[in-house]
A protein has these predicted regions:
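Soluble non-cytosolic domains of exported or imported proteins
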Residues: 60, 144-151
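Active-site proximal helix-loop segment of RNase H-like, two-metal nucleases, encompassing DDE(D)
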Residues: 100-105, 109, 120-142, 156-160, ...
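Active-site rim elements
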Residues: 141-144, 204-205
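Retroviral integrase
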Residues: 1-127, 174-237
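Active-site-proximal acidic segments at structured loop/helix or strand boundaries
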Residues: 149-191
Length: 237
């Protein structure tokens, strides 16, 4: 089979739009779906949303999520300068914010209060999760499918321009990644869809199956256009 040619989907964002938004303010919160924990964020002007899976409720896992988040913004040449969050993140953010130069300013909500923008972000993501869940033909979902359902629900909210955002023409994803969507890579298959993956066992002169029964999870970030799948036989992605 011939390899898929790598094509560029880069899009040029006006410099005046990027320069004004270089310093990013985030609202951050935790969210639980079917006992799975996620760290959710939304940027105040770009309206770029994220939902990162947190395997265990320990500081090192949250710091890993924060490092991944900072890398996403830095790759787009943005810098997170301020974070709004609840008091539950006080211990984590006090140590994490000072690791950056200049330090990240952290604004904590008052006692018994929450960050309104972060709460609305959680509510919006959960609405998308419920809508997708009721579209699926399954009565029960494995934990790994729930994990990807939440992460993809947040990611797809970045596909379209936000009416309260900085641009009516450029989506949060386009502004941050400076890349257009590609139908074959990003939209051809839906989460939860039954697919068959091609396998090339080694050695190849056996009666082993050449296709694997899978449930579609999401596209990969590679330029070649790969996909992440849930293998039904092993329940592994």
């Amino acid at each position: 089979k011939r390899p898929v040619p790598v094509t560029s989907n880069l899009v040029e964002i006006p410099d005046e739009l990027l320069e004004v938004q270089k310093d990013v303010i985030l609202s951050m919160d935790g969210m639980t779906v079917n006992s799975l924990k996620f760290l959710t964020t939304i940027s105040h002007e770009l309206f770029y949303r994220t939902a990162q899976y947190v395997p265990t409720n320990v500081a090192s896992e949250y710091e890993k999520c924060m490092d991944e988040l900072m890398a996403v913004y830095q790759q787009g040449q943005f810098q997170v300068t301020e974070i709004h969050c609840d008091n539950e993140f006080h211990k984590l953010m006090d140590s994490y914010s000072t690791q950056h130069d200049p330090p990240i300013t952290v604004n904590y909500a008052s006692a018994q209060e929450h960050v309104p923008r972060a709460e609305r972000n959680n509510r919006t993501i959960k609405e998308r999760v419920r809508a997708t869940y009721h579209r699926l033909p399954y009565e029960h979902l494995p934990r790994i499918l729930v994990k990807y359902l939440v992460m993809e629900s947040a990611k797809k909210l970045n596909f379209f321009p936000n009416r309260h955002g900085v641009s009516k023409h450029y989506s949060p994803r386009m502004i941050l990644h400076q890349e257009n969507l590609d139908y074959d890579r990003h939209c051809k298959y839906a989460l939860g869809e039954y697919v068959q993956a091609h396998d090339e066992p080694s050695p190849s002169n056996t009666n082993a199956a050449r296709s694997l029964d899978c449930i579609y999870l999401r596209p990969t970030a590679s330029a070649q256009g790969g996909h992440e799948l849930l293998h039904l036989q092993t329940n592994q992605d």
